[in-house]
Amino acid sequence: MEDVPKQAHLLPAAVDYRAKHSPDTVFAVLPKDDKLEDGFFDLTYAALAKAVNALAWWLDEVLGTIPATEKFKDFPTVPYIGADDFRYVLLVLAAMKTGRKAMFSFPANTPEGLARLLELSQSKVTLASACHKHIWSKPLADKPEIRTIEVPGVDTFVHDRPVEPYAYDRTYDEGTTGTPKPIVWSNRWIEEYIGDVAVLSRHAPADQKSAVYALCEGTRVPNLLPLSWGAGILLALQVPLFAHTVPVMLPPASIPNPPTADFIKAIGTYAPKGPRNGMILVPDMLRHLVREAAGRESLQQNEWIAYVGAPLDHATGDALTALGIRVQSMIGATDIGLYNILLNDPQGWKIHRFPAALHNYYLDRFADGLYELCTARMPNDPRHVFASAPELDVYRTRDLWRAVPGREGYWSNAGRVDDFVKLASMTKFNAIAIEQIVEASPAVAKCLVAGDSRLASFILVEPAPGVGPYDATPDSEVIERVWPAIAAANEHLLPEARLSKELTVITLPGKPIIRTAKATVQRRASLEIYEKKIEAAYAAAGYAKVPFTIWGEAIGDVGKANGHAR
């Protein structure tokens, strides 16, 4: 499929261009009903354009038509919380056509957080799917002037009935979609950081292709990331438009929270396949799937697997590579977008390259052979982090990298700045890397390593079901069962940083380590639950009380502390 011409790079214009020049080309695959086994249908660009027009007319009907003299000036915000379905994609496009901008908030945000977003965005109305209207009740408790409107289901807009076209004659210019509020993706940001990069990658030499766009080109990819996330909408709308990905939308009623390994295998069974297929998963899910034959068989239907949200342990990545699956990291930040990592060597999935001098990214020395990825402000920079902070000249991503010995220009991911534990001895190590080694054991469901400002680090272990303590096994026996995995991790630590049995703490029944929506660990929240048990382990091991919390925050009068010597 040909590139969208530059003057049609505004998203609604790009959809209309595709609908005119490639009407029967499939944009996305949508579910027929609430279950995976109910089947799917193809949504063409012609059908997409018609659905966007239908929703645009609906928005004008319920919100009022913005006068032509005022349209495309202030871009009033339309907040939406809903079921994880195609309405998110349609709302982005229809809001733009009607002179508005859609704002998506994660449904799990606190009422206080949602109220703050409404205040910052100066929202006058809220939208929601039927099953999510209640989420707005508390944030709007003292805002009677703001009403909530229910957005009808996808089939109200995606249908075979005729729809009058909704005119959209905007062409690309140097303006943005309005004053940045919470997180604004401007038209120029989409143009320069998605559209232009996709075209650049498509026509680049083989060794200079962007990983995201090279892999996604012409590939069917199940949409497993929440559409209220920046990455979710990016992979369901912008990347398909400019890189020809075909997102496979899943029936939201069937998606467990969090997704399970059985659900991922069911996608492999029921979701329609194309000539090229890929999948984007969090590392924790990949670890579960590669441990079982059915999981490996399901994953092998994909040409490539991308991991997001956290680093992938070497054992899991190597296992996927051995299955003939290409493994690739996709990493970025909502404030600045995707990092344009180049497509890696299939056999060298652990190491990465960056394009030279693209978007002012550079690696800045952090410590001990580690470098932090940074990006400097460019003239008239459209990235949100710079547009919203005029005084900021450099954005530090907090993502750390290590140069690969003997491979100039190649880097391995070394976690994040806040992934590192610094002991009282000033010995520093990557806790995430150690956790990945321990979690490779089938005896361990999840673990957390910490110990900032202590003489010794500790490990909190959530044993796998059947290992304990869910079968009333004493902690001491559980520790013996998981110890081989911890001992293997110790081989990668300096002697003073090694973990000990006496500072191995086992989680309690009904109180697992807390996960985020990305299946990564909520470190502080988990440690707060087990603060007393961990402090008791330090005391039993003979360590004196210290003026720091177990997550490393100073307490009391640090200047008068008499140390934490054994």
Enumerate the predicted regions with their spans:
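Conserved AMP-binding/adenylation subdomain of ANL enzymes
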Residues: I194-R220, L224-N277
